[in-house]
């Protein structure tokens, strides 16, 4: 079954609030085998909402509306749909009693417009609103399913979980949806796609969906099957084919982010870490400490932004700073080695470079060096040539630090 989500509210079009309901519903619907191919946002306008309904009826089996069920004049979702379907609106006695009781308990006047919230489509299944006033409803008519939900997420989400999803399962095939996200770093989206293009072109079940986000690339594998274990087998087969080709860039699944994977491996190896940050100004250390229990492996860091700190605290030779410059392979090497020794850690990592927007030391923005000094191992410096805004370059540099740390830890 194919669905369209129609969010109603001028405040959404004006950007005053984000349409988080659509994200929530899309994820939930996918998990029970309902495809969402369109998101529509329409303002509080009867004519435009009617047009949106007509368009959606041409391309979807299920229309899911959020918003416009309240007591004011511009809350017109129910009225517009009732007119479109030639259905009457009738009072739901349970909802009316619940709303009336609320006003009695709070000592407020129960005005006529508040009674409007208890109106539902005649013949609809009513979804109780346990966290607000206006009930939701579902109606199957003319081969289409119409779902009306309140706009506030704190009302809509629990209503969906408790009442709507069980109702929707009557319209599904019983197939289970299983998804797995593969996370990659150090390879661009276009490069990765080239290596797995034939798999993407031939996808059926499971499907393969690439997504690039802030220097990372993910592949979401999604399979449908009535037996979840069989769905997992379908996923695993395609994953194996993908990792045969781009496994060197793979680092984790789903919500396993780079900093988490690197720190977990650090704990597993029983090694300690120290960082020297010039370019990143503490971003790397901040992400390290987002991980619980990290004090067992993280000694600390030095923000060595000024050359005086590089020279007098981390003992980068003056001739390196004056000849090679602070943005250099040699400087990164000294920073990594000396912060490791200073803080008595097993591993030292360093970041130096040009974040921009202007050049520095005759080096262009995006010129970055990440140093990695591991006890009893040769020091390695990774030169990077990054693009983006000042903040993006700094954040991506920190990510590359975690990536190279993770890959090096895998080797030892």
Swiss-Prot record:
Superkingdom of the source?
A: Bacteria
Provide the transmembrane region boundaries: none
The record ties this protein, via Gene3D superfamilies, to: 3.30.70.2860, CinA-like, MoaB/Mog-like domain
Family, per entry: Belongs to the CinA family.
- Under which name does UniProt file this protein? Putative competence-damage inducible protein
List the taxonomic lineage. Answer: Bacteria, Bacillati, Bacillota, Bacilli, Bacillales
């Amino acid at each position: 079954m194919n669905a369209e989500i129609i969010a109603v509210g001028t405040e959404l079009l004006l950007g005053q609030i984000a349409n988080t309901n659509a994200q929530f519903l899309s994820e939930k619907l996918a998990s029970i085998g309902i495809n969402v191919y369109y998101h529509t946002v329409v303002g509080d306008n009867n004519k435009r909402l009617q047009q949106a309904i007509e368009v959606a009826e041409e391309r979807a089996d299920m229309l899911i509306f959020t918003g416009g069920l309240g007591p004011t004049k511009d809350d017109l979702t129910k009225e517009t749909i009732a007119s479109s379907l030639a259905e009457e609106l009738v009072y739901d006695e349970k909802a009316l009693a619940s709303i009336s009781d609320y006003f009695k308990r709070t000592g407020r006047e129960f005005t006529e417009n508040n009674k409007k919230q208890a109106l539902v489509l005649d013949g609809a299944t009513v979804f109780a609103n346990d966290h607000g006033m206006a009930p939701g409803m579902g109606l199957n008519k003319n081969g289409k399913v119409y779902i009306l939900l309140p706009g506030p997420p704190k009302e809509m989400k629990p209503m969906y979980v408790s009442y709507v999803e069980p109702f929707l399962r009557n319209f599904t095939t019983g197939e289970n949806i299983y998804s797995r996200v593969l996370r990659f770093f150090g390879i661009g989206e276009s490069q990765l796609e080239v290596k797995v293009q034939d798999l993407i072109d031939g996808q059926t079940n499971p499907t393969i969906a690439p997504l690039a986000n802030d220097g990372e690339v993910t592949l979401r594998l999604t399979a449908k099957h009535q037996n979840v274990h069989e769905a997992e087998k379908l996923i695993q087969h395609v994953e194996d084919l993908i990792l045969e080709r781009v496994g060197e860039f793979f680092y984790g699944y789903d919500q396993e982010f780079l900093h988490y994977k690197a720190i977990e491996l650090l704990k597993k190896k029983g090694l300690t870490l120290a960082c020297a940050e010039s370019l990143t100004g503490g971003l790397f250390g901040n992400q390290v400490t987002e991980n619980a229990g990290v004090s067992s492996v993280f000694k600390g860091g030095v923000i060595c932004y000024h050359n005086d700190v590089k020279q007098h605290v981390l003992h980068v030779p003056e001739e390196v700073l004056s000849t090679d410059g602070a943005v250099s392979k040699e400087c990164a090497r000294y920073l990594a080695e000396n912060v490791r020794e200073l803080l008595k850690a097993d591993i030292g990592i360093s970041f130096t470079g040009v974040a921009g927007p202007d050049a520095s030391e005759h080096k262009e923005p995006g010129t970055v060096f990440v140093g990695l000094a591991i006890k009893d191992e040769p020091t390695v410096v990774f030169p990077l040539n990054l693009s983006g805004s000042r903040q993006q370059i700094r954040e991506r540099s920190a990510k590359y630090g975690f990536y190279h740390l993770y890959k090096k830890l895998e080797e030892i």
